[in-house]
Amino acid sequence: MIRAAIFDIDGTLAMMHKDTGTYAALPGAVETVKALSARMPVVAYTNGTFFPPAHYYPLLADAGLHLKPGHILTPAAVAARQLVAKGYKRLLVLGADGTRVPLRDAGIEVAIPGDEGPFDAVMIGWMKDFGAKDLEHAAQALWGGLPLYATSVAPHFAGAKGRLLGISGAIAAALQNATCVTPTVFGKPEVIGLLDIAAMLNIPPEDMVVIGDDPALEIAMARKAGAFAVGVTTGTASAEGFASAPEPLRAHVTLPDLAGLLSQGWW
């Protein structure tokens, strides 16, 4: 029985206009979120770290998408919980406020390239402006033996004008190429974020539906965790793209948009 609904944001619920940093809801999203929220917990779990979690609420509300407090999750928030549990106190962070704020809120000191060590690890998130000196500083820390973490290594995500580059993945790839250090990833398709949601709601993944636009991210995460997976073709992938995924990681259902989600017979 489905007892909770987990939605991706970009390409599933809404599209971001990069120039303005605002969202526009996708077809059926507003009505679906409103109707489902009256029936069960609804959580938005994005792979993005453009903003701290708290900043997403008014942006999505402006697009007509209203989520309850504590029901928007980013991989930076997942990372913060996990790294505190590891006992980390100070991180070298290549990332903007979307990564820094959750870490600070969790009690971790955030250092940036140019700051003196020691650091416990290197953490990568989305950032708009970075250069060779930032990469060099992080590489030196990794050559010194520190572990590498990333919020997401997705190559791209859906935007209002087409695909947008996954900056954190690009930075991680550059550092891995230079240092041969493989990042530990907290975002989708890793299941740790979905397990955090399961713990928060006290609902196992087997009783959740996960809806997303990327077969390699939220759909793969859902299948690995045992959740029911629904793909929508409003973002990065076509129906053929969903169908071509290997069966163990393939969406159970693929829809053209969210407008027909509530009429499905598997609820």
Describe these PLM feature segments.
Residues 1-9, 13-35, 54-73, 80-267:
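Asp-based, Mg2+/Mn2+-dependent phosphohydrolase catalytic module
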Residues 46:
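Conserved phosphate-coupling serine/threonine residues in phosphotransfer and NTP-handling enzymes
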Residues 49-52:
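Canonical radical SAM enzyme core domain
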